[in-house]
Amino acid sequence: MKRLLIVLGALLAPLPAHAQQVGANEAPTVLVTGANRGLGLAWAQKYAERGWNVIATARQPAQASELQELAARTGRLQIELLDATDPESVDELAKRLAGQPIDVLVNNVGMLGDEPEQRLGTLEPDRFDTYMRVNALSALLVSERLLPNLRAGQQKKIVGISARVASFAAYPRIHSGLYYYKASKVALNMVLRNLALDLEKDGIVVVTLSPGVVNTYGTPDNHDAMSPEMRASMTDIDSSVAGMIKVVDGLTMEGSGRWYRFDGQQIEW
């Protein structure tokens, strides 16, 4: 009898944290756009390591070697072709994902571009249009087309990645220049604010997140292009994304329509 009780106790003991992974069919699902590198790759990696089902999009999946390695290693990652600025590509993704609940949508696609082309005297209307499509329109298209998936999800959360330089309240501390980038991120902020208003009735939380100044493919290598404040506030990708995921975990309808830093601090518009 004593031996039987010991065996039963071992069977009923709680599993260690790393072993409490739910099955793929029971786990929540996150979709991350622009997940082939930088912040997007970090979002995908951290959610996969948490046991979530991850749908990671890239414009050229065959060349997304780090995503492929992550998929093979975790068994939790599905790579999908997507050009988030192309309505047809977004529609095709929505068709492929029809009936798939999505708990969290991370609109990560974005571009900072080259600082010299965004100065007075060098501006080109076509380039401005490109930045607007990448940094603002993409989030609107993807969020709209995937609304059925988000409504079917349990958590119902949409996030977009903006930047402190798009805050009017941050002036005059923000440096000049970067006309395309700043204007397009301001547009993204309004897209997300409008989505928050429209989707409140569906119980979908929509927020803007700022990763801080991180060393990614979107950050200029030339630190002279940054203000002293930006240089002093630089953080690493892992800390930034871990912080943003913590913010996402704690989101409720009360916080919908707001803008948060990766450390949870609210940013004024």
Mark where each language-model region is.
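Conserved glycine-rich cofactor-binding loop
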Residues: 36
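Conserved Rossmann-fold cofactor-binding substructure of NAD(P)-dependent oxidoreductases
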Residues: 84-100
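Rossmann-fold cofactor-recognition segment
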Residues: 71-88
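Conserved glycine-rich Rossmann-like NAD(P)H-binding loop of the short-chain dehydrogenase/reductase
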Residues: 50-65
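Short beta-loop-alpha junction of Rossmann-like oxidoreductase domains
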Residues: 169-171, 210-223
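C-terminal helical subdomain
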Residues: 201, 208, 220-269
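Catalytic loop of short-chain dehydrogenase/reductase
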Residues: 111-112, 118-132, 137, 151-201, ...
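Rossmann-fold scaffold of SDR-type NAD(P)-dependent oxidoreductases
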Residues: 33, 102-112, 135, 160-162, ...
